[in-house]
UniProtKB/Swiss-Prot annotation:
Key words, A-Z: Coiled coil
Coiled coil: 262-293, 699-751, 905-932, 1217-1255
Sequence segments annotated as region (Disordered): 683-734
Domain of life the protein comes from: Eukaryota
Protein name, entry field: Putative uncharacterized protein DDB_G0292556
Naturally occurring in which organism (per UniProt): Dictyostelium discoideum
Source organism phylogeny: Eukaryota, Amoebozoa, Evosea, Eumycetozoa, Dictyostelia
Amino acid sequence: MNRVSVLSKYQCLKINSPNRFFSKYFTTSTINSTKITNDQSQTNSAGKEISQPILKSQDKLKKSILKTSTDTNFLKDINKKHRQHYIKPQKDDENIILKTLNDLKTNNLNTKELISDRLSELFLNKEMIKLISENEIESINEIFKIVLGAKKSQQPPTVAFFTKSFLNKSSKEFKMKLDSLPIIVYFLSVFESKDIMKSSDSDSDSTATNNYLTVGKGISKKFIQNFQDSISSELDITDLQEHLSDMIKLSKFSRLLGYLTNVEISRDKIKKLKDKNEIFNQLINEFGENINEIEFQNLFKNEIHFISFLLTLSRNQIITILSISNNSCYEEEEEVEEVEEVNVKGEGGELFKRVDKYEDNNKGIFNQNKIKSLIENIPVSKVRERLYWFLLMAKLRYPISENYFNDIEISLHYEKDPSFILFFFNHFKIFGYIPSDSSEAKIFQRYVRVATLDEALHYFDSIKKKPQSLNIIMITHLLLAMNKFNNQLDRKIIIDSTTNTTTNTTINTTINNNKIKKYQRSIENEMLTLYSSKIKDIIGSNSSLYNFTLSQLLHGEKWRKVLFNTLVTQLIEKHINSVTDETLLIINEYFSIHKDDVILKKLYELSKKIHLSKELLSNLTIQFLIHKRDYSNAINSLIELYKQETPILKSTLKLLIKSDPTHPILFEFYKTLPQQFELIEPTNQEQEQDQQDQPPPPQQQQEQQQEQQQQQEQQQQQDQQQQDQQQDQQEKQQIKEIKPKLKEKLESEKLINSELFLECINDPMKLYRILDGKIEILASTFQSIVMKSLESGKYQFVESIISKRFGDSSKSIDKHLLSKLITIPNLPISKDDPYNIEKLLLTNNRSENLALYNKLFNLSLNNGLLNCAKNYILKIIQQSNQRLVTSLCYQGEEALIYSYILSLNNLNIINNNQENNNNNNNDLKETIENQIIKWIESVFGCNSLNEINNDDFVFSILLGFHHSTSAYYKKQIGNLNEQQQLPSSLYLKIRSNLMQVINKYFDLIVLDRMILSSYGLESKYYGEAIDFQKDFISMITINELYQYTILKLNLLEKKNNNNNNNNNNNSYYRISIDKKFIENNDQSFNEIDLLLKNISTKQISVIVPFLMGFIENPSLMKYLSVILSNDLNKYDTATTTTTTTTIGNNFIQRLMESSSNSKEIDFLNISNTFFFKYFISVGDLKSAFKVHFKQIHILIRFRLIQDILKNQPLVMDHIFKIISSELELEQQQQQQQQQQQQQQQQQQQQQQQQQQKSSSPSLDYGLIESLLSVTSILNDSKSIHFSLKLYNLASEHAKLNNSRIPLSITNSKDLVLSGFKNRNDHFQLSENLKISDIEKQMKQTRGAGADGADEIIIKNHLTSSQLLNDIKYILIHSNYKQLKGIGFGVLRGDIPFTINDKIKVFLLVEAFAAEEGREKVNSFLNTPSLLNNSLDFELLRTPKITKLISFIFRTNSSIKHDSNYFPEFSPDFLPNKFKFYSAHLEDINNNDNDNSIQDISNIVNCNSGPESFYYRKVLKYFFKKRILKNL
């Protein structure tokens, strides 16, 4: 019985597999180490549901199976009868089956009463299977139970037959569950058992057995397929097969050990196993009781297969097995609770380490010390044993320290089988241990070290196929492996010489030095191609990866330098945006190592192209100049630095000191520094004495000493180093000439480089003492001292020097210092004296105090000092009178209300965190809320809002509030807990107040003006301003707009009449309009008509915002378009007065006149926006873009154009046509300029000016960039094509003007394409075709046609679907003109494609070029159906395309006709080629009568040659015509 209990534990052996799908489902049940008795197994069987893979109730069945499978007698009865023992069902059979099934469902089936053979046979009967399936048994486990119940069915043939028929017939009808897998595996294991083979007595028996074995294997395959279908499509069939066979082998102990270890690894060791089988049988049969102590120890210490067997079990099972041995020399293991399985996937792809700790109470066989001693006792030569123990440790989740990793490294160092290293490495990861980057790299390096070159390259190839797996660690492995390859042959020789002298001599004789060099060269080339092709693509814009790779290439062989150069070039050309300061520092370091001028130049180029930190830029520039010995420029640029920001100079000088501390330029520069202290320059004799009093940095003294030493050395070695000395003298001479200029500049600027001094004299107090009293400390120096002191916490010192500097004297505190102090993140605010800094800073009652209070308020809040915060906010509210806040707004401070609102939200959050002070905080919050509302009301309630400044103020408050609430709500809603509710009450209160204010005072002109100017395009509030404008215009009715407009007109007149009269009574300007009058649409329309008709030119600017209100409100837009429309028919709904027809025309003309004459940018922007929106809404696209074309990018920034482009795709084509027509116009003008004489130039200029006003002829790169940015947001195929067209247009324009396209445009285009690529995976190019290759080839062979593209296509494509995919990609991402030959190349017949595929390719490429086909192809390109055979050719069938294809069929004999696709191309379609030629030419001539037939016939008839030559010429001509027309 003991044997059975042990065996039962292995029925659900956990599959140890990297396949995550498996780990999800194959969870092991917890196993008790207690023995299971008969009673338990019987009593437990009835009531329990079948939920786990192996049930205790089935132990009997398992026992019987195992006994029969190992019992040799049962095979003697095997003969053909077994396969024919099935009988026809009788009438009662159905009832029996149904009853049995019912019992199964209700769990009444008692396994004690073993089911009769008859019942078992019934279940095996083919005709009964259907009946069984109709009864919906949830799992096939129950059926198997019944089948196993009968003795006869336990014999392999019966089981085989049943399994086969059952799986074949019913797997789709039954729901197969994973828990049935172990039972099925049992069946399958019977056929593969060695015992069957051993026990066959006669030949006939063995053949029968073999038949069953083959049946079994067939079943297993069939089963795998069904299993895969029914369980999950995720499963990889090969994986499943592999794991299934593992399970089969696991479940038979007789073959357990041979398969538990990785078969590939240990083939040689399997033979040795037979001798040791006895130990294992003993271990298994008498497990835990009679095992010999020594044998048990030996098992652990020396038997590698036993450990590998343990590795295949679940953690609990391992512990159970190892803890059973009571009599062994090890302590007894207490029962261990199952720890949850650790998620080995890792979230977000990050490297991770074990989180859970395995509690080790120094009990049981497996405490860490014992494992450690075990490992230490294993001889170093037994590498595998040690490594397996490490794996076992990992499996049991012991913490593996760095020391262990070292041990692993050492062990791996001696392991010579690369496949085992891979096995080890992968399993180590599976068990959830990811070593640090360096450890992993080292471990993996061992693999590369023992692998042959081929194996390693094969590994690299596998990486190449999965670019995403090429992470930083893998690159490390590759780079580390490089060195090894270069010396691999030598290593082979060395190793072989140590092992075998004969092989050494043979190798030496066969491989001579030349071959070794050649071999190394090939390796270098291989690595270079691998890196330059793959890694560049993979790295892309990943700057950290780039930097890592570059840093790895700093030292080493020649190919590394080559690669470094190519990567840097690639960086400059393609990924300039991913260049960081770090990148430049690496390149700089490379230069300092190799002194490579080429790199330095590239670095210099690079630094010019990108917006780097000024620091680096200056460092590079100066280094470059010094390297070129251009000292005058170097010093000049140092002076430039000196004028700008101090930190730059500091780092530049530091860098120079680092690279060459004795460089003369440094001394000269340092010597000039003391001059700016306004000290009398000491004479040479005094200089040494006064040195200590002056504050030059300590480095300077060292530098000077070094210089003196250097001069002495030079004198000593004068004879040897004459040239060097001369060079030095020249340099010094140059510097002497520059020195006076340098002094002049520095003295005139009166600068001080305080940062440099602070850097050299670290202690700010010391520096202050050095400077104090001797010279007037400049503000910047003082500021630095204060800031440094505050950082280091010397508050008293700061207090004393500030009070000394500002306290007694009448001087007010320095503004810059104040602004700096306010920005200190942790300005000290103590609970005892919250005003300690305040006392120092608040000298008089100037406006900066408000900002300071604001800062102090926020600080108090962040430090949790709520009472301080309350005091400060009350002070702010008391102090902030309207003028003060207005002036602050003008100073660029954020609207204060913004910070208050955010602060309240913070208070609220603090409120929730500090539950103790809940009531106080609520009170505080309420008082502050009330104060703010009172404050807002008081500010808004004052009667002097007529001044424009105050409109600004109101707007800034509104905008600030809108910004703070919307931004805060957007940001915080996701991040806050439910408890932390936002102060919505305040929001609603203020919002209602705002609406009152808006209704009372709102001014659309102010709004528009503020949006367009003060909060201009660059403002961070810009987006919020637009949203806000939309918000509040949407609340306004047409009546209010009209009323408001009248109000503004009166206001305007009033202002004109009384310029000096400040009338504060707003109601005076309000005109009360009768509601009935407003509600009567006809009448109000008439009023508006009259208003528009009679408005004076001066007043037009007032009207525009009114009209804008219409446009912003879609429901009102229709009224406006009716009023302004010139078309009477559109005006049927309203009253048709005589004035209406002319109003629209007059008004728009007058508005255009006034806007063209106006110098006010604000008005221009508003009116142009209006025109654009108005024309778009009316549908007059041409006018929309002609009105004021240059303004489109403003509209784009307004976010207006996005909606228009989305809803009206035609707009894109219009924009493009306008841009391109203007470009043509510009070209014409250029030609005219060349032809005309100087006398006509003035006229020409006048014309140009006029045209610029109307249509802006020069190409506006900013506009193109803006449009590209819009299309990147839209991200659909139309916008992609549009952006590519724009980009091509810009590049053509750049070529014409011999200029370069701005980098920003290229980046915008790349952004568009990358967004598109991410969205449509099926547009990716297949791996073996790179678009850059094709484009490169096209450039080379552009003159000779498109043969290059054909060759590439032919070389790289074996399947048509892949080619179609690539062509799709090319059409979308490239300029068609470069690739138009692909279609012909495919049709030529050189590619082994079917005719249908050829036609598909041809149609795609050429229809894209033909005008009729292009739109269809565009829509077609967006559907994935391109890859299916169900290509709808009707989409592309146009008259010209049809003729073209028939022409190809007629002229190219290598294309066989397929009438299914194109029935009209049957041989009878055209009698002969000549007719077709003439018809075709006639057709071309009729459509394009600007060319004569003669030209075409010349093309066709030129040269003799193969027929394909002619058709290509004709087609080329045809498509050339098409392309020119379109582009």
